[in-house]
């Protein structure tokens, strides 16, 4: 069982394969050249226990054995991987996506992203669909390591920015075929921009940029969004969809969605 996830912006199209971990044995043969996978890895301790019980090896070992890891594969969470699994990720140059708020919500712990970054691994910042407000994800990424380790010195703001800005841009550049031009204002880069209405109360410079964002920015400051040169939001008004109509339709259909959900839960017992 496998689903094909199409990511598209105008003529930018790439595919990553998302699949259930139990179907690993057929994945290597199914993977076309130049494509990668997206999979959750060791989000909870139970994932590792289940893998050891059923297959006699840890989750990361199984992915490594079946050729799933690689420089075009994204592994989300990686909270409970051990040293050997970490070495597999590093050896294969696999992407790691840190999901702080999702991990907090599910009370599963936190990935050791500081040591991964120090070791030169490709750690990005995601949100597991929690919300689409990535600046709040910056904040939680900054705070979570301090709480987990009970040490206010943990998780430097520059490390948060490295994950969220530089590494995310590198991953997007690879996925959409723009290389190191993604996330930059340079010739031939994609025209993807947001305008932020931010009025700093103190000096705003490279020495405090991560903390200005972490403590001072919010999604409500975004006034305009441009994707591939096209305004998707202008002066805080969406240009391509009728927001009121979408909201009204959502209110209309959500009771049916919930009814199907409860019907499924009742069948599963």
Descriptions of predicted regions:
Residues 65-72, 113-200:
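His/Asp/Glu-enriched, well-ordered alpha-helical/loop segment
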